[in-house]
């Protein structure tokens, strides 16, 4: 089963860097990282993460979804050949790894499922300075906070705040995006952690089989091999999705 119920506590030590070490990240990410931080790196984890997210937002116009190995996906996105929120989240993961930032990738769906919402991808990074996980939506360029406290919020804080949270952008001007309302201010919105995603394994299969099989077949091969990722739902019972 790809989907599993979990708890907030059980996910404390579940993050992308466990499966993906710096030495396994493709070389193009290191080359682009030099460009991102050509003026030097900020000191804090959150400021480094924001710098990465800002560069990606300013240099990737987005477009169609990509089903490519990570290095090919990054190349395509930089060249203006597509990229949706999940593509942005996935390449952000790799930049965080090479900058020694703990990172997680989350999907957001509706429970019960509602086909008018297409789903969304976002990230969390662990800030050593704040000693907490911080939700950062790379494709929307936003963080979240409580009205009277400017400390950025974790994903769990956002989804258990009873909509008392606000968001702010780290772009030049604030944005009003209907998807922000749909996925962060909606009682049906349910986050799930993408757990145990091994970038090297998916890169290997996608590179060797992408001209021979559809992407969903490649993912099924990986699932049969026992090396697939899973979706972990800490706040809602995923079994209610189609009831």
Predicted regions and their residues:
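A structural signal for well-ordered alpha-helical scaffolds and beta->alpha junctions
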Residues: 49, 89, 172-173
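Detector for Asparagine
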Residues: 5, 17-20, 33, 43, ...
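Alpha-helical and coiled-coil interaction segments, frequently adjacent to or embedded
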Residues: 153-243
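Secondary-structure boundary elements
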Residues: 3-83
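Hydrophobic/aromatic-rich core segments of domains that either
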Residues: 90-164
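Charge-rich, low-complexity amphipathic helices
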Residues: 74-75, 118, 239
């Amino acid at each position: 089963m790809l989907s599993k119920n979990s708890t907030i506590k059980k996910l404390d030590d579940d993050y992308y860097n466990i499966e993906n070490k710096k030495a396994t990240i493709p070389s193009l990410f290191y080359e682009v990282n030099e460009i991102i931080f050509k003026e030097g790196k900020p000191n804090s984890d959150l400021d480094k993460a924001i710098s990465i997210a800002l560069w990606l937002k300013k240099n990737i116009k987005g477009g169609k979804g990509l089903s490519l190995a990570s290095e090919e996906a990054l190349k395509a996105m930089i060249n203006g050949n597509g990229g949706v929120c999940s593509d942005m989240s996935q390449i952000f993961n790799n930049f965080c790894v090479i900058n020694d930032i703990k990172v997680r990738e989350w999907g957001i769906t509706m429970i019960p499922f509602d086909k008018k919402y297409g789903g969304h991808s976002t990230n969390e990074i662990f800030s050593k300075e704040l000693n907490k996980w911080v939700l950062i939506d790379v494709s929307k360029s936003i963080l979240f906070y409580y009205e009277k406290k400017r400390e950025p919020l974790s994903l769990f804080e956002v989804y258990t705040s009873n909509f008392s949270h606000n968001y702010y952008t780290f772009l030049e001007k604030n944005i009003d995006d209907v998807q922000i309302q749909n996925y962060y201010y909606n009682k049906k919105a349910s986050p799930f952690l993408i757990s145990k995603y091994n970038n090297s394994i998916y890169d290997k299969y996608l590179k060797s089989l992408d001209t021979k099989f559809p992407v969903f077949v490649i993912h099924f091969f990986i699932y049969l091999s026992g090396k697939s990722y899973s979706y972990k739902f800490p706040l809602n019972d995923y079994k209610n999705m189609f009831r």
